Amino acid sequence: MKRTKIVATLGPASLKPGVLRKLLFEGVNVFRINFSHGSPEENRKTILSVKKLLTETKKHASILADLQGPKLRIGTMKPNTKVLPGDNVVFTNVSCVGDKKKVFMTYSSFPNDVKIGETILLNDGKLLMKVISSNLKDEVVAKVIQGGLLESNKGVNLPNTRVSLPCLTPKDLGDLNVALEEEVDWVGLSFVRHKKDILELRKILNKKNSGAGILAKIEKPEAVSDIDAILTEADAVMVARGDLGVEVPLESVPLIQKMIISKAIQKAKPVIVATQMMESMIDSLSPSRAEVNDVSCAVIDGADAVMLSAETSVGKYPVEVVKTMSKIVTASESSSTTRIKGRKPESGDDRFLSNAICYQAAKTANLVGANSICALTYSG
């Protein structure tokens, strides 16, 4: 039995008749509903489909409602709009159909928040621009450093900018109501920057008497800097490598991933590693060797779960990718290096005696091949 959980994102590919059931039986432990896509009622229907399946099969799996968060995007563009290095582009918060001269930005406070010299990244970092001026009202002028196609509704990242948008947008609050009405197990909070973002969501959950856990998605540099406080307040964290890899230098992502996993283990908080884990299996029946290694390393480092995104939501082989990931996880867990994830207790720890007993119990269980450890308590 694998201990590392598999999170599968639901979408058109996995919601085909019979596929959802196969995913469950092949090893999915958490079904993720991405509220960035679909209407609230469509997502409610998906949640109900999962619940019906779990009732029928008498199997256990969690449901994660992943909120979109303050994702920045450009508006509609004219077809085949291409910008070249050296071009100047005007970003406006006044709605328009964009061209190579002017682009609509959905973020209304953009002219007030950005500063001269800051970076604008578009389409997952494929296009790079630098701010050269702002009228502090409705327009920002940027110079193209790395050009390419400007396509409609593509995402925007501002790695140097302190964005004034709230962590929970009006859309998120509407989606959250649906998720809580259907009693999901987890709520994913996107683009977390500081612990106060988690406290804001916690206040809403408490007000609605919800027992849902908060999954803080680490995808902003500010969140990496405040990781200790975030781990204290959140119920679990996700290393969301997609936007994180755009917001910070790519070469930093593996080190940040290892650091977050290590800190999560120390604080006994579940940690998920996500994004492009088995990306090639969107179109291929087998993963690349690098992807196999990526999943395995996450397991060996101590990740509690590994996540599939487009692989199961829109990929050609959703069942096969879960089956393959499950095999990789099981094989990786057979290594002795994955048995005991916690660090050795130090005499200066506040709970040194309890920690030392638990640590040695785990080592002994591993040595003798025990199937389980029984802990007796007074209070439960």
Stretches found by the model and what they are:
Residues 1-380:
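Non-catalytic helical/linker scaffolds that mediate oligomerization, partner binding
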